[in-house]
Every structure is written in C-alpha cells, then in structure tokens.
Amino acid sequence: MSSPVVLITGATRGIGAAAAVELARRGAEVAVVGRDAARVRETAEAARAAGDGAAPVHEHVADLTLLGDVRRLAAEVLDRHPRLDVLANNAGAMFTARHVTAEGHEETLALNHLAPFLLTALLRERLAADGGGRVVTTASTAHTGASLDLDDLEFAGRPFKAMTVYGTSKLMNILFTRELARRTAGSGITATCFHPGVVRTGFGKNDGLLYRAALTAAGPFLRSPARGARSLVWLALDPAAAGLDGTYVVDERVREPSAAARDDVLAEGLWERSEALTAA
C-alpha cells in the first residue's frame, strides 16, 4: 500500500511542525508549506529523520496572506504531486492591529479563511481523484460567541479587536468545513475541522504584550505542540475519521460547535462571498 500524501500549511512551527513530524513517523509522504524557506527546510529535515526514509518529504514556500501566492502554491502542488490524499489547512495567526495586504484584504481574513478556501478549491479535483481525499482545517473554540457580518468580513467598519477578529475567522473555518462537506457530498472527500487546545507555540508572536502575558500566565496549563497536533494526525490518517464529514472535533471526538457555526444559511452566504473575494 502506498504512503498517503499529506500537504500541511503552517508547518514550520507549533502544531503544523509537530504534525509533519508525526505523520512522517507514521509513514506518510509529507509536503511541508511555510513562508520562511529556512524554517520549511528545518521542519522537513525533522520529518525526514522521523520517517527514516519510509516516504519522501517535500518543501513548498509560500506567503498565504497573498492569494497570488496561494495560486502559485496550488500550481506547484499539482505539478509536483500526482496524488494528494490530505490537505491540512493549518496556517493561521492573530494580529493586534488591522493590516491590509498588498492585495487589499485584511490580513486575518486573508490568512485564516481566504487562503484555505482558495487552496482547497484549487486542489479539490486532485483530492477527489482517488475517491478518498480529506480536508482537515484547524479551527478553535475561540469561535464560541463569535458572529459573522457577511457585509463586513474585512472588519473595515467595526472596531478591530484581536480576539474578536480571530474568533470570527475560526467561525469561518467551521462554516467552511460544513459547507464544503455539503458541496462535495458523494465525491469521496471528507471535510473536518478541529480545536487543538491552547498550545504552547510561537503563534502569539504577532499578538501584543497583553496576549503574550496571558499565555505566559497560563503556561503550566498549555498543551505541547505534539498534543495539539494529535487530532490533526488522527483526522488525516485514521480510518474512523473517514465517516466524520462536516464535523467539528475536539480531542478526537465530535463536538457540537456554536449555533452560528451550525447555521447553514450563513455557511452558504460565506461561501458565496468567499468565491467572489477569491475569484475561485
């Protein structure tokens, strides 16, 4: 049996790096995606060591805050990987201030939602080719209490509060997963998302002194990246996860997300807005 091919974004630190290493250790063919070439190489080398040559480990460099880079990455993946079994949409960040990318999108929206939405759209046929592809997206319990304004996804007309914006992006991840499952029903693709727990990682480096202080105080209660990556690895490889289409998972168990995250009308509206924003 050939090794499953798994593409992981945000794979140069934290959950993504830990998942890449564990997937390689389990015999998967891993494709590491990150913005920094040196860090991509570092993760890839760690994965190669863990896999002990059982399967190749590939390196891809892309800035996923830019949709142009997402398109370039997708073209590169399609060119280099004749088969793709799992797309792990793991890249994400929280920002304390509102930044607009060179393409005109608020940075949190661009990285946390539009990038995985577009990358999935561009790789969807390859994932479905063998009738068993999986899309695993890193969400968060931060979605709880978040609401979504389809007329202001960019937070252009509202106060920019880091946790609110981040939580909204995680709500989008769950709605995206739900709608993707609906739209790909019968294709063989399984779409899931998960909460990794509060993980000790470099995630908060863009998040301001107050947020970093809170993480420092919570230090003894934080999970290791390896523990945080466990659900990602399980959803990517375990046969039992193939039947969990459209679900939200916490600690390898299906959980019910917020009411907003279960709103199918909202999910469809977000999908349509996302198609317009990405020209997908």
Give each language-model segment a name:
Residues 2, 50-56, 76-89, 95-100:
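A glycine-rich helix->loop->beta "capping" turn
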